[in-house]
A protein has these predicted regions:
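Residue-level detector of beta-strand face positions
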Residues: 3-5, 39, 263
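Short, surface-exposed beta-strand/turn modules with glycine/proline-rich turns
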Residues: 238-243
């Protein structure tokens, strides 16, 4: 039986029996040809030359003056309690006893998740002489609320403290040779008819709002401090290039733009490796993907363990209305194990009573290990330059606290 076979480089191979030919036209199927990307450039530079040009153009490329940044900040945490044991418990407060503590530990969740989202205007300057400022627009949070049993135990402990501990007492906490002062709040009831009591409550509320705002500034500052051109950045691939090896530069596509792609790995004690994406026209780093390849921090001493084993993420820099690049997006993942295995004493003292100042004492040994993972994300919707005078006139005053939600189901920044 005779066959006729047709084969060509962009045609699907086809075969026919000669006896089946009954037409002068033979239909063949074309096969798509996959071609690799081809980049043509007149800049044949080594990675060392590219890095050198990045350094040379830092001041020209990146915004270091006063800016107003319209931001969305998200921070999600997962905490797993690997071990939590309290023994050798002694207490001079009758209601605070070992059985109550055992009930408390038995009802504590082994895993807790939380989330906090904030929309704000964040004001900054590269110069550390000027404190960063924030105007919070709104904020929301979610976390595991206590169960009924745990809430009941906490209420019982709170009542016992209010009954036995005096509002004008001061407190010391000791762990072996270590010691310090301890503030215990909430022992005073707020009397709505007492002007002084109300004033203290209002001052406390203002402080909480101020502390929340400062906490958000601290989180955002930490992200900006990772920018590769910041003085104390841990991502010092560019400021200290002698500490790193750089791969041969590849041409790649990022979004719709051509970029140089360079891999960076540490030579010695440096802890981070990274992928750098560099604009070939102005030699600006427009994206960094980084990851730690060694523990960021690890200590085990005198019953205290801290092991920061994870820090990775990415940072994207973009041009907004001006001609310079600013941070437009960042995500940093963080993981650490913390352990504490030491004796603790909580001592109540009061100088307004006759006799000895020591009133009550609670002592125990705590053995605790937790694993905490957090993911912090910032999206900058807009960034614009402002004058030093405008920056100085901005008041650091916050009236916003996060609203609680059982879960986040909506797009928080849609109307922003």
């Amino acid at each position: 039986m005779t066959q006729c076979i047709f084969q060509y480089w962009d045609i699907k191979k086809s075969s026919f029996l000669i006896k089946d030919f009954n037409d002068s036209i033979i239909k063949l199927i074309q096969t798509p040809i996959k071609l690799s990307d081809v980049f043509l450039t007149n800049k044949k530079l080594s990675s060392e030359e590219i890095i050198s040009k990045v350094v040379e153009n830092i001041d020209k490329n990146y915004e270091k003056e006063f800016t107003e940044n319209k931001t969305y900040l998200s921070r999600k945490s997962n905490t797993i309690t690997e071990r939590f044991v309290i023994n050798k418990f002694k207490s001079t407060v009758p209601e605070i006893n070992k059985s109550l503590i055992d009930s408390l530990l038995a009802n504590l969740a082994k895993e807790n998740n939380s989330g906090l989202e904030t929309l704000a205007y964040y004001y900054r300057s590269f110069d550390d002489e000027f404190k960063k400022k924030i105007k919070i627009i709104k904020s929301r949070e979610t976390y595991n609320k206590e169960g009924e049993v745990l809430e009941s135990i906490n209420e019982k402990m709170e009542e016992a403290f209010k009954k036995e501990l005096k509002p004008d007492s001061y407190y010391k906490i000791k762990s072996g040779i270590f010691g310090g002062d301890l503030e215990i709040e909430g022992l005073e009831e707020v009397d709505s008819t007492n002007v002084e009591s109300l004033k203290k409550f209002e001052e406390k509320e203002i402080k909480e709002k101020g502390d929340f705002a400062q906490g958000q500034i601290w989180v955002i500052n930490r992200i900006y401090n990772f920018l590769f051109f910041e003085n104390e950045t841990p991502l010092n691939f560019i400021l200290k290039p002698n500490k790193y090896n750089f791969s041969e530069a590849k041409i790649n596509i990022l979004g719709e733009d051509l970029v140089y792609q360079i891999e960076s790995t540490p030579k010695g004690r440096a802890k981070y490796s990274a992928t750098l994406y560099i604009n070939p026209d102005d030699f600006a780093i427009v994206r960094i993907d980084f990851r730690n390849i060694k523990p960021v921090y690890n200590i085990k001493l005198l019953g205290i363990l801290v092991n920061i084993y994870l820090r990775d993420g990415k940072m994207i820099l973009s041009k907004f209305d001006n001609d310079k690049y600013s941070l437009s997006y960042a995500k940093i993942n963080f993981g650490q194990r913390v352990g504490f295995d030491r004796p603790i004493k909580l001592i109540e003292k009061n100088k307004n009573v006759k006799g000895r100042r020591k009133q009550n004492e609670i002592s125990f040994r705590m053995d605790l290990i937790t694993d905490v993972k957090t993911s912090t994300e910032i999206q900058v919707f807009d960034s614009k330059s402002i004058t030093k005078e405008k920056f100085q006139k901005i008041e650091s005053k916050n009236q916003i606290m996060p609203e609680y939600h059982e879960e986040f189901t909506t797009n928080f920044w849609e109307e922003f």
